[in-house]
From Swiss-Prot:
Signal peptide: none annotated. InterPro entries: Elong-fact-P_C, NA-bd_OB-fold, Rib_uL2_dom2, Transl_elong_fac_P/YeiP, Transl_elong_KOW-like, Transl_elong_p-like_YeiP, Transl_elong_P/YeiP_cen, Transl_elong_P/YeiP_CS. It comes from Pectobacterium atrosepticum (strain SCRI 1043 / ATCC BAA-672) (Erwinia carotovora subsp. atroseptica). Coiled coil: none annotated. Pfam families: EFP (PF01132), EFP_N (PF08207), Elong-fact-P_C (PF09285). GO terms for biological process: peptide biosynthetic process. GO terms for molecular function: translation elongation factor activity. This is Elongation factor P-like protein. One of its GO terms (cellular component) is cytoplasm.
């Protein structure tokens, strides 16, 4: 059991007799005094795959589920299925493309370290990515000389197809670090 303000992205909750995977959380702070903060959560139903949206007050109690986490590595694509191998016992985990469509925007062609498969009671629930990823910019407007003092952004397309705003001084071919949960530019990659 946890309060709504303690729920994070990637957690699984039991709500209305449904297992729901938290995909996104919007926090809405009221302007009136005494009003409680609202948490608008978008879920994916684990059993049906349907999208569900619910609102909670910050002190609402929600039943959370403890998940088993296994570290995996992206292996190969088989039709519309993506195969990930367990790093310890090499067991394959299969995901349909529509199950992990959001996550695929952050996984580079050669894979990335830190990917985990979440399971509960032997059932595969989701794929969890690390907090950051380094990706290469493949398309953006040319860098503007002297734009380093500017705080303006421009859209940039990454090697995976992801489009995020980046500072004006960056150009195509540069590797940048992206914060996955917020989909934002963090800095140049090492």
């Amino acid at each position: 059991m946890a309060r709504a303000n303690e729920i994070k992205r990637g957690m699984v909750v039991n709500y209305n007799d449904k297992l729901l995977l938290v995909k996104d959380i919007d926090v809405q702070s009221p302007s009136a005094r005494g009003a409680s903060t609202l948490y608008k959560m978008r879920f994916s139903d684990v059993r049906t795959g349907l999208k569900v949206e619910e609102r909670f007050k910050g002190d609402d109690i929600i039943d959370t589920i403890t998940l088993t986490r296994r570290t995996v590595t992206f292996s190969y694509i088989d039709g519309d299925e993506y195969v990930f191998m367990d790093d310890e016992d090499y067991a394959p985990y299969l995901f349909k493309k529509d199950q992990i469509e959001e996550e695929l925007l952050f996984i580079p062609e050669g894979g990335m370290p830190g990917i985990q498969v979440l399971s509960w009671d032997g059932q595969i629930i989701a794929l969890e990515l690390p907090q950051t990823v380094d990706l290469e910019i493949i398309e953006t407007a040319p860098g503007i000389k002297g734009a380093s003092a500017s705080s303006r952004n421009k859209p940039a397309t990454m090697s995976t197809g992801l489009v995020i705003p980046v500072p004006e001084y960056l150009s195509a071919g540069e590797k940048i670090r992206i914060h996955i949960p917020e989909r934002r530019y963090m800095g140049r990659a090492d």
